[in-house]
Amino acid sequence: MAAHRFSSLLSRSVPLLSRGGKQSYLGRGVYRYGTAAAAALEEPIKPPVSVQYDKLLINGQFVDAASGKTFPTLDPRSGEVIAHVAEGDAEDINRAVAAARKAFDEGPWPKMPAYERQKIMLRFADLVEKHNDEVAALEAWDSGKPYEQCAQVEIPMFVRLFRYYAGWADKIHGLTIPADGPHHVQTLHEPIGVAGQIIPWNFPLVMFGWKVGPALACGNSVVLKTAEQTPLSALLVSKLFHEAGLPEGVLNIVSGFGPTAGAALCRHMDVDKLAFTGSTETGKIVLELSAKSNLKPVTLELGGKSPFIVCEDADVDKAVELAHFALFFNQGQCCCAGSRTFVHEKVYDEFVEKAKARALKRTVGDPFKAGMEQGPQVDADQFEKILKYIRSGAESGATLETGGDRLGTKGYYIQPTVFSDVKDDMLIAKDEIFGPVQTILKFKELDEVIRRANNSSYGLAAGVFTQNLDTANTMMRALRAGTVWINCFDTFDAAIPFGGYKMSGIGREKGEYSLKNYLQVKAVVTALKNPAWL
């Protein structure tokens, strides 16, 4: 489809996972699941996939780390080891950057006709689509997110991203600019060179697409550092990229840890560009390391504490469902999650009761079990951090409506949790929890909620639920956020730019805007002798 939208997948498919007693059309069949609180946790289901690639990808070859070290990637359902993956460090980053530099300076990729790059990217997208179920299963196993979500939402998103950026490959061009005097002035849009990219664990492949797609479309080479929690899916799809004809050295993947591999990539003098998605604290370090090395430009997509505002004229049932999705999707592990739910005082009590009931109906269990809306959190650190915030909320005076504890005794499952009577100065209303914890705050006036919504160091996204066009128009302009969703949430498209205000980041990813991250603009001025019409 010419205008296939991510939002159509999210708005049609994901909400079906969030209606108790309804049918889910995610997965290969049609499944029915009940309205009991949370699914009983059983022994983990054997994943329908095996780990084939656990080494570093450097110069087109899968290789061991120079140190010979490996680290375990764990199954969030049990805490057990899935595989031991090569642990890259500074020496491996040096090898990967050298390969990327040679591929850029001497290889065919930046010099080949743009439509040839386009063909390779399209072949890659076709191969991932062909292997959709295998890639989705590996993603679900390593991250803990529901397989159905991966298979029917995230992998199709990934494919769409590469088809979108393939379409841009042969449409990048400069301008001819009229200037004073007898001169011909033009601009050249040139690939920036070697791009260093660091992706997070919450959407490993989607973030791969956001970063690698535009970089390659512009003719750059890439060194990608994966998150240590979720290294497997990137290695699998990189194999498919080389099957599609990607030249050696154009894409290099190093699995490892931030203080060793990540820091080495950020400070490397032969890296021309950095892109990072992760926490605000780490983003500051990335920016500092760039500044202290070669001042390479940096794109940052960082934390968020996004408001979801339910106005007094809202259809409460629809607002409850959308607010539930805005917060709980992906186990609450979304940088743009609607994690501050502001509800008008006239509908507050009704909203709280229905939000509690909806959370109680949320199905939580093994990601490979049909109909699961929520799997485990990604790892023990994230699990413990979320439980600590839940305790903080209860201790600070918020009302715990439901949830508030771990689910089962094995793995990193947390009960869907809802707090009411939340105040702006509570930690659960200020900090990015990154988990299944909904905080519901009351407001009275429009100006008041705008002020409170903007009173945050973050500015990644916001949501507004209203039937009043004037209210919507006021909100979309007043809210200090990179994305404002009106009567929807988490509506994504490859063409829609994404990024934050304030401490939520620098720059934009996705869409035409993202291409600018990976291009240098060169002005060329040529003196003219006796021009015919100047």
Curated annotation (Swiss-Prot):
Active site: 301, 335
Subcellular location: Mitochondrion
Ligand binding (NAD(+)): 199-202, 225-228, 258-259, 278-279, 301-303, 381-385, 432-434
Single GO MF annotation: phenylacetaldehyde dehydrogenase (NAD+) activity
GO biological process, one term: green leaf volatile biosynthetic process
Free-text activity regulation comment from the record: Inhibited by disulfiram.
pH-activity note: Optimum pH is 8. Active in a broad range of pH varying from 6 to 9.
Catalytic reaction list: an aldehyde + NAD(+) + H2O = a carboxylate + NADH + 2 H(+); acetaldehyde + NAD(+) + H2O = acetate + NADH + 2 H(+); benzaldehyde + NAD(+) + H2O = benzoate + NADH + 2 H(+); 2-phenylacetaldehyde + NAD(+) + H2O = 2-phenylacetate + NADH + 2 H(+)
Keyword Lipoprotein: no
Subunit and partners: Homotetramer.
Its job: Component of the floral volatile benzenoid/phenylpropanoid (FVBP) biosynthetic pathway. Catalyzes the oxidation of benzaldehyde to benzoic acid (BA). Capable of oxidizing a broad spectrum of aliphatic aldehydes; increased carbon chain length results in a decrease in its efficiency.
Protein name: Benzaldehyde dehydrogenase, mitochondrial
Organism: Antirrhinum majus
